[in-house]
Amino acid sequence: MVNKEIAELSVLQSITTTETITSPSNARVRSTMKLRDAAVRRETGLTLIDGQREIQRCLTAKKEIVEIFFDADSFASLSDTDKKNFELLLREASAQHASLTPLSTRPFSKIAFGNRNEGLVAVARFHAGVL
């Protein structure tokens, strides 16, 4: 079982070039948390997208995803099918030039919405429509 977990982690490491962020007080985690505030979203032109289905829809629509944070700790507990889908989504995001940032569970829980933890949160650029 240990060899399988090592192989799975190496797949994630081959996709991302950054170290896993383990501190909830990390500057990138804190700045991402601020995007929960509507005024900050309007000021920055960035928004949070939580969940695999929602992120996949953005990728399919060719919306600009700046960065995807993923819970590297929970990856090991996914089913084989879910791991494959998770990996495919990360590869597609990387191909569209999104940064991929692994987080441990504690900092990830700070940016995820409520109890809904699908292991993925994206930061995307949006263009507000004119009313």
PLM-predicted stretches and their roles:
Residues N115-L131:
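Acidic/glycine-rich phosphate/pyrophosphate-binding loops and surrounding catalytic core
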Residues M1-N115:
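N-terminal positively charged helical leader segments and presequences
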